[in-house]
């Protein structure tokens, strides 16, 4: 069984929205109380409380506070589990010598939502093509909320968990489905072998010279973003107008995110449908987008320029594109080969003679000093990773096996159903 997440937009009425808001407030209160309990226990008696210590106290909490009963035991346990995971991540970073980031108290307006970690306490019903209903709770206190969205996995998909989130005044429900391999299989319409070099000048360059333009969603919205932030800076902090402009800034960030995901979903889907082999190189965007500020003793150089470059790297969504290619390739029976960048050096290696030709980042044309081969820098890199994909025993990623459906019918064509209300995934 495979797992796939589908997101629905919720349309609760005023009473349901007020009730959901109160539930988020209670989950936030539980999270903060559990965090305070852990801190106090360590400060007073030197004891570190575990998840199970706090989970065992839930019956007493529900007996003293009746409003916690309707939230459901499993949802309350998941909130405590979130705090436990935050502490595990904190101790892991301390051990690794990284910036620790101690878990912090959360304001209810910034608490994103809550989760039902199993199918108990809620139900999803698909009504027609794009309409759905999500029922939360049981008995006479249960509430039904209209939702918009659909999935392409059919009636055989079994709901696994539900996450309710509030974002910029809107409500969403993310449902994890357990589906069979046949249900999530994608039809592949081509058998091309393509090398891809992801970048910033062009979002993608292929070994045959074709390119995909970089949409630059953040850069296109920067004038509007700067204008809103200037207006907000002139308002009194905490005032109605200050908050109103803050919501507009958040909406603009959300719009940029939606445009980016839409572009990535459509582009990666089109790519895995047309290719039997996709070759690319390993990208570590976290390292690529590190700050150049430095320290007080060793201040960084060209900090503003590096900040602008980091913004462009993150705006391109290259890491998200790799993730989408990985799971969609499994569904379509496409092999994705990820070359080891440090060993292969695709931007410095000649695709014709395989010799290393050092170049600076400003040199956009590859001219080999050994064999005279000339090509665009990104096209040459794409050709190098494609050759590497055809070399046995190379690459850093496991090669996914085709699903049963693709082994038998790799060229069948079926109509794709959008995985969510907003994009075709």
Q: Which residue stretches match the model-derived regions?
A:
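Short glycine-rich, polar/acidic loop-and-turn segments at beta strand-coil junctions
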Residues: 14, 24-25, 35-37, 89, ...
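Stable alpha-helical structural segments in soluble proteins, enriched in small hydrophobic residues
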Residues: 34, 79-90, 379-389
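Long, hydrophobic, amphipathic alpha-helical segments used as structural scaffolds
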Residues: 35-42, 87, 91-98, 179, ...
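Gly/serine-rich nucleotide phosphate-binding loop at the start of the catalytic core
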Residues: 1-78
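Acidic carboxylate diad motif detector
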Residues: 52-167, 294, 311, 315
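Residues on one face of amphipathic alpha-helical coiled coils
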Residues: 26, 30-33, 37, 82-85, ...
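Positively charged, helix-rich recognition surfaces that bind polyanionic ligands
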Residues: 3-5, 18, 152-155, 161, ...
């Amino acid at each position: 069984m495979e797992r796939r997440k589908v997101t629905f937009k919720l349309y609760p009425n005023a009473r349901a929205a007020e009730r959901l808001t109160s539930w988020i407030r209670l989950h936030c209160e539980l999270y903060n109380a559990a965090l305070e309990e852990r801190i106090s226990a360590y400060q007073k008696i030197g004891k570190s409380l575990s998840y199970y210590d706090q989970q065992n106290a839930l019956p007493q909490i529900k007996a003293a506070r009746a409003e916690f009963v309707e939230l459901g035991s499993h949802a309350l346990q998941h909130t405590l589990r979130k705090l436990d995971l935050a502490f595990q991540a904190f101790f892991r970073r301390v051990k690794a010598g990284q910036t620790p980031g101690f878990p912090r108290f959360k304001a209810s307006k910034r608490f994103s939502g809550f989760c039902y970690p199993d199918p108990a306490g809620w139900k999803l019903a698909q009504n027609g093509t794009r309409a759905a209903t999500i029922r939360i709770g049981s008995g006479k206190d249960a509430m039904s909320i209209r939702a918009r969205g659909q999935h392409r996995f059919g009636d055989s998909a079994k709901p696994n968990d539900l996450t309710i989130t509030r974002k910029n005044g809107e409500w969403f429900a993310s449902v994890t489905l357990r589906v069979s391999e046949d249900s999530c299989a994608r039809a592949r319409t081509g058998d091309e072998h393509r090398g891809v070099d992801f970048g910033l000048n062009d979002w993608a360059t292929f070994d045959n010279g074709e390119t995909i333009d970089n949409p630059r969603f953040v850069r296109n919205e920067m004038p509007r973003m700067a204008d809103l932030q200037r207006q907000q800076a002139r308002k009194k902090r905490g005032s109605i107008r200050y908050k109103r402009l803050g919501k507009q800034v958040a909406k603009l960030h959300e719009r940029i995110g939606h445009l980016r995901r839409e572009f990535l979903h459509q582009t990666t889907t089109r790519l895995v449908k047309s290719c039997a082999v996709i070759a690319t190189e390993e990208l570590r965007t976290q390292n690529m987008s590190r700050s150049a500020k430095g320290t007080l003793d060793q201040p960084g150089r060209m900090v503003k320029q590096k900040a602008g470059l980091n913004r462009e790297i993150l705006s391109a969504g290259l890491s998200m594109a790799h993730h989408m290619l990985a799971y969609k390739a499994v569904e379509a029976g496409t092999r994705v080969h990820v070359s080891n960048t440090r060993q292969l050096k695709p931007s410095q290696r000649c695709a014709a003679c395989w010799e290393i030709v050092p170049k600076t980042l400003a040199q956009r044309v590859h001219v080999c000093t050994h064999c005279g081969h000339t090509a665009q820098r990104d096209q040459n890199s794409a050709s190098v990773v494609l050759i590497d994909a055809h070399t046995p025993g190379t690459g850093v990623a496991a090669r996914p096996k085709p699903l049963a459906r693709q082994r038998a019918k790799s060229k069948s064509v079926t109509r794709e159903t959008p995985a969510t209300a907003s994009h075709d995934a």
